[in-house]
Amino acid sequence: MMNRVVLVGRLTKDPELRYTPAGVAVATFTLAVNRTFTNQQGEREADFINCVVWRKPAENVANFLKKGSMAGVDGRVQTRNYEGNDGKRVYVTEIVAESVQFLEPRNSNGGGGNNYQSGNNNNNYNSGGNNFGQAPTNNGGFGQDQQQSQNQNYQSTNNDPFASDGKPIDISDDDLPF
C-alpha cells in the first residue's frame, strides 16, 4: 500500500513551534494549495491543508518560513483522534511532512532556498539549495558566487528565425497535427 502526498502552496499564517515533554520540536502550519481547475466564476479555489513536521526540520520551518511563504511538502496523510473537552471523540487529518522545501529565496516574501528532510526517527537533515539540474557546489548549495560570474559572461542571442521578420506565417489548418 502507498501513502504519499506532495504539495506546493503558501503558508496561511506563521508556523507554530512547540516542544514535547521529551524536548522534541514539532511545528504545525497550514498550506493553501490552489486547485487545478476554476469555478463557474473563473476563479481558482484553494484547499487549506494542515501539516506537521518534527525535530530539526520543525525548528528550521519555524525560523525560515512565515505567512505567505511558498513551500513544497512531501509526506504522508495521518489521522489521529483524541477526546475533546466535551467528552466527544475528535478526529484530525493532517500531513506529516517528511521533507519541506523552501521554494523562495531568503530575501523575498519569506523562506530560504533550502530543503530540510526529516528521517523517521533521527535528527538528520539535508541543507542543499534549489540547484535543479546543476552540479553541486562547495558553498552549501547556494551557488550565488558562481551564478553571478556566469551571468556577467552571458550574452543574449536571439535564435528565433521568425523574430522581427515582419512577414505573416502561412499555416493552413491541414498543416496542424491536431
UniProtKB/Swiss-Prot annotation:
Q: Which residues form the SSB domain?
A: 2-104
In its UniProt record, a GO molecular function of this protein is:
enzyme activator activity
Low complexity compositional bias, start-end? 115-129, 144-160
GO biological process terms, alphabetically, are: DNA recombination; DNA repair; DNA replication
Highest taxon of the lineage: Bacteria
NCBIfam families in alphabetical order: ssb (TIGR00621)
Q: Relate the protein's function as given in its record.
A: Plays an important role in DNA replication, recombination and repair. Binds to ssDNA and to an array of partner proteins to recruit them to their sites of action during DNA metabolism.
In Swiss-Prot or TrEMBL terms, this protein is called Single-stranded DNA-binding protein 1
Query: Which species is the source of this protein?
Result: Listeria monocytogenes serovar 1/2a (strain ATCC BAA-679 / EGD-e)
